[in-house]
Amino acid sequence: MAEALVDFHCHLDLFPDFEELVRECDAAGLYTLAVTTTPRAWRRNHNLASATRHVRAALGLHPQLVADHGDEIALFEALLPETRYVGEVGLDAGPARFRSLERQREVFRRVLVACASAGDKVLSVHSVRAATLVLDMVEAHLPRGRSNVVLHWFSGSKAEARRAVD
């Protein structure tokens, strides 16, 4: 059995040599999910990744950017049919982002509803200091079997981790 390496959450487009990194990941056989932070960044990532065997682009709206880019949720919803992969999305209730938490919740709810409607999505979900809230929202808006969720930046308890696995 051949071994394969997977990086399920990498912000390749935040590096100055983004295009070269995509080529290097592909040449090395490193399966990479290139998550985006805004829907406007997705097209460039998708175009580069679609020319590779090992790199895929994910459509995202990062919770840390929702205060300034939350209006891009309509663009997110419009682009969603073009991809199976979604990330980075979620909630960040850390001190620096707590003021935008209600807006984050609304955006994340719309992401989950859109993914539930489309089905067969794979989500990379940011969950800083918000594990219970993230799990509550996933359970409420993304019925089991409609998509798969991987928690990223999980800072929850053991009980929350068990709940996520169950």
Where are these regions (language model features)?
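Mid-domain alpha/beta scaffold segments of enzyme catalytic cores
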Residues: 1-166
